[in-house]
């Protein structure tokens, strides 16, 4: 069964908009676990516009499910990973000023850099994942780095879903089958929601994990957090 990791960045964004500690990121993350989330994801950025370094330390002390930290692996990020030692690190090539992650790695162009990162994170006992698009050659290059997993960037799927869902998912079906044949685990994330998640998961039998934040938190405004997580888990219970 595909695991659900809840990205709590949006909770931090809401807190930071007003100051103080409401909503409490740690409490929400622990409630997510209690309500059935199988992991917690954060994406700390240098300007701390949502998740702060202090949040990452607090979460590490308290979480009982898998902790996934994603981000651009600059020196500051690498030091944070060394100190926290999460279960998984997802390497994302986003610039500091982007609103949200909007592209995967060109692995061939960054091959040596990614190889060094994978080797270092493995030395610290951390599972690695490379954020990537569906290009098959790019996935082959990712496998050569020694990474454990890839995370498929799913915004193109979500954007095209209502136009032609079969065509939208097909590149991901091919990509996941290719990755699986190379021994890679497969994660996915970006704009997955209650509308498009089940169809996606049904067609990717090797899908290990999805990380979902924005849509899940938006749904929770109407449904409540516990019911929302239950519904997302239900979409993945294939």
UniProtKB/Swiss-Prot annotation:
Cytoplasm keyword on record: yes
UniProt-listed Pfam families: PdxJ
Any Gene Ontology CC annotation: cytosol
Alphabetical keyword list: Cytoplasm, Pyridoxine biosynthesis, Transferase
Gene Ontology terms: biological process: pyridoxine biosynthetic process
EC number, as in UniProt: 2.6.99.2
Active site: 43, 70, 190
Pathway: Cofactor biosynthesis; pyridoxine 5'-phosphate biosynthesis; pyridoxine 5'-phosphate from D-erythrose 4-phosphate: step 5/5
Keyword Transferase applies: yes
Major localization class: cytoplasm
InterPro entries: Aldolase_TIM, PyrdxlP_synth_PdxJ, Pyridoxine-5'_phos_synth
Residue positions binding 1-deoxy-D-xylulose 5-phosphate: 45, 50, 100
Site feature: Transition state stabilizer: 151
MF-aspect GO terms: pyridoxine 5'-phosphate synthase activity
Location of the protein in the cell: Cytoplasm
Catalytic activities: 3-amino-2-oxopropyl phosphate + 1-deoxy-D-xylulose 5-phosphate = pyridoxine 5'-phosphate + phosphate + 2 H2O + H(+)
Sequence similarity: Belongs to the PNP synthase family.
PANTHER family in UniProt: PYRIDOXINE 5'-PHOSPHATE SYNTHASE
Physiological role: Catalyzes the complicated ring closure reaction between the two acyclic compounds 1-deoxy-D-xylulose-5-phosphate (DXP) and 3-amino-2-oxopropyl phosphate (1-amino-acetone-3-phosphate or AAP) to form pyridoxine 5'-phosphate (PNP) and inorganic phosphate.
HAMAP family for the chain: PdxJ
Protein name: Pyridoxine 5'-phosphate synthase
Species assigned in the record: Porphyromonas gingivalis (strain ATCC 33277 / DSM 20709 / CIP 103683 / JCM 12257 / NCTC 11834 / 2561)
Lineage: Bacteria, Pseudomonadati, Bacteroidota, Bacteroidia, Bacteroidales
